[in-house]
Amino acid sequence: MSRLPAAKRREQLLDTAVGLFAERGYSGATTSELAKAAGVTEPIIYRHFKSKKDLFIAVIERTSDLTLEMWERGLAGAKDPAQRLRRLVGSNPMVSEQGRGVYRVVVQAMMEIEDADVMRALQVHISRIHQFVTREVAVAQDAGQVSKRFSPEIQAWMLLHLGLGYGVMAPLNVPSHASDTAGVRVRDVISELMLGERARHLLDERLTRIKDRGGDIRDED
């Protein structure tokens, strides 16, 4: 067992816990299994986390941080609020290469909501995600690119509900569950409903880029 600085050891334990909790769930995973997977002894785990539940909650909190960081990187360089919102609609952490593992832990956590501490951690997680999306919708509204008929808060909830449903269905591999025979995707429909003409303009730009490369509409996010 190699010695690591405390901060790096904590990160290593969190990384290992993500995979274990995602596969076995909170109830099914044990600290003994975690210690073995991380190459440490159980007392090392308890130096960093008071209990298995404390570790599980830390993983949920880390998922929030990783999701917001991923979104910030993905939205960087967008030329206007409408494009930021369109990118956000297409950036579901539940199905992304980076996010799907950690988000399986969130789904597992939803099975443990009888525990008040886990429930509270999930509520904080969802609230942070909702606040981020709400700000993006509000900025697009202020720029005149999204209708103000509905509040940014309720539109953000709509996006989260759709994103969660998509994320749950995606692993089932139901044929064409997210697009039709013409290749139009759910994200295109959502974007047009929210952004109207601006969404159509962004879609036309994307189609032109794909056509120039000789590709297919489903080749680009």
Task: Specify the residue positions occupied by each region the protein language model found.
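N-terminal intrinsically disordered/low-complexity leader segments
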Residues: 1-8, 149, 172, 198-221
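Generic hydrophobic, amphipathic alpha-helix propensity
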Residues: 9-17, 34, 59-63, 67, ...
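Helix-turn-helix
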Residues: 12, 20-54, 58
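Hydrophobic alpha-helical connector segments
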Residues: 58, 69-102, 152-159, 183, ...
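Amphipathic alpha-helical packing segments from all-alpha helical-bundle domains
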Residues: 65-68, 73, 116-143, 153-157, ...
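Amphipathic alpha-helical segments used for helix-helix packing
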Residues: 97-117, 168, 172
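Hydrophobic alpha-helical segments that form the core
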Residues: 148-170, 181-193, 208-211
